[in-house]
Amino acid sequence: MRRKSFQTAFVISLFTLSACGSTTVAPAGSASSSNVDFGSERILGQSEKNPSTPFLRFAPDGRLFAIWSEDHDVLWPEGSHAAGHHRMSGDRAPSPMRNAFLAWSADAGKTWSSPRRVNSIVEAVQGEENGPKVAFGKDNKAYVVWSTPGEKGDKTRANIRFAMEDGKGGFTPAKTLNEVRDAGRFPIIEATPDGNFFVAWIDRRIDGPKPRQLYLMRLDSNGKALTKNYQVGEGLCECCKLGIAFADSGKTVYMVDREVDGQKIRNHVLRKSTDGGATFGMPVDISNDGWQVPSCPHSGPSIGRDSRGQLHVTWFTLGRSENEAGIYYSVSKDGGKSFAPRHLVHANTAPEILYNNLLLGDDDTIYLAWSNLDGDKKSQVYLRTLAADGRTWSSIQHISATRGNAGRPVLALLKNQLHIAWTETDGETSRVIFRSATVGQ
């Protein structure tokens, strides 16, 4: 394969409840790296509307925001029938429509504002890896992106939607960012150090059997496009989330994604820009996992940059054999030129897809959350920390406690307040679970 450079021109209920092929196994734990003591579970959103796919982020003023999607209300007409059952007016009907909701907490998640719907028109807001994301301007305004299916309802031919707070308690009318319709999926949005915004997504405007492309655009603080859509990479796995990090006041931009070659081998790569995201150099392999799988696993990498400039990446792979399957970690100490041999953080207990999320504390402690199967073959959420020395791992903590399945965890951290949220499913129903902890004491 490869590689060339590209150039631009609510009601919130509270319930207690790179060395190729090289691998090193992280130690089981250390007395000097203690576990995180989380508080009781809270439920975000309206449980009867099946909330799912949360995303957490702090605004500059210290408020914690959560965004998620949930079912749109549809009422059966008086005396109507569905699936052979008589429905009375006022009963909810199944609906493919989903809305994005945003809420905030000013007291570390103890209490929350009423959720606000972000999308101005009812549409099928996508979830899972493709769920809504939020970033914040220097004035604390929220900027949100999400994905909706194309005109024919095809999730693989979708559109990137954007809205921002309007300063009046609501959101601007949603607009589509991809200039070629029915071509964008899996968007992320990040505030740049200069006060603007990067939006990145996986694009299929050049259709065919080849892998997808990586596209970017820039927005200003008013939501106005500063650039057209532009391609910065190719060969992407079409259904895995992206990651982004900045350095040098935004002059250096790092992006991570999962690549796929002609033999359907799927490895993760780092892309680096030294001109503020205008152009990106050739991809660097993070690890040669050699995972060959015919379809996209819907499980992308996470990236973080510490105070020393080191890049930390986590990901999931099934590898070349079942014995290699699990969540992995690696670090680059030379600005992304190379990566250390991968560390196995948690071995896969069954041939299932796992999901991960990473963030760094002010003291360069790494917090890593992921999903894996327990002894009953139920998906559960786990957490582990890596101290700033890069050697001291905590033990693996089981964070969720559900009779169903828990997955797709996300993290947020401000000073010593760590927060985690995930989607819990039981049959056809889902809900969003939230927990908090004080760390670093």
Language-model regions: role of each:
Residues 1-10:
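Bacterial N-terminal signal peptides that target proteins for export
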Residues 17-19:
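C-terminal motif of bacterial Sec signal peptides marking the signal peptidase cleavage site
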Residues 23-441:
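Extracellular, repeat-based ectodomains that mediate carbohydrate processing or recognition
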